[in-house]
Swiss-Prot record:
It comes from the Eukaryota. InterPro entries: Glyco_hydro_22 (IPR001916), Glyco_hydro_22_CS (IPR019799), Glyco_hydro_22_lys (IPR000974), Lysozyme-like_dom_sf (IPR023346). Residues 1-18 form the signal peptide. This is Lysozyme C-1. It comes from Anas platyrhynchos (Mallard). It is found in: Secreted.
Length: 147
């Protein structure tokens, strides 16, 4: 019993840090944080991108062939946007540690996404958005959500 309690208390902080959002829950959070029509991109675009980038999972990470890593619900890259302490010559343009992108609270991820989308290439910075969302009916990603 003592071992089980120890395990639970060790894993509890990990569970509290990340989250897999539902589609509508994420849409509501993104809207509250000002992403709806930010730089001309509807909320459906952002939810679509998050679906294909991370499956709405704030703890998603993916290692790239150049040695950088993508983090969080929008898979923000350590080469350009955040600092993971491992990626050589990281620009850290959002001025944040990559670890904050793995939290259940997506405030920092949204703040950084706004910086990225304002950088000149818009949502084209997200490969999944370019390949799966651009030019499609993204309104389906928020259909039925109470926003």
């Amino acid at each position: 019993m003592k071992a089980l309690l120890t395990l639970v208390f060790c894993l509890l902080p990990l569970a509290a840090q990340g989250k897999v959002y539902s589609r509508c829950e994420l849409a509501a959070a993104m809207k509250r944080l000002g992403l709806d029509n930010y730089r001309g991109y509807s909320l459906g675009n952002w939810v679509c991108a998050a679906n294909y980038e991370s499956g709405f999972n704030t703890q998603a990470t993916n290692r790239n062939t150049d040695g950088s890593t993508d983090y969080g619900i929008l898979q923000i890259n350590s080469r350009w946007w955040c600092d993971n302490g491992k990626t050589p010559r990281s620009k850290n343009a959002c001025g944040i540690p990559c670890s904050v992108l793995l939290r259940s609270d997506i405030t920092e991820a949204v703040r950084c996404a706004k910086r990225i989308v304002s950088d000149g290439d818009g949502m084209n910075a997200w490969v999944a958005w370019r390949n799966r969302c651009r030019g499609t009916d993204v309104s389906k990603w928020i259909r039925g959500c109470r926003l």
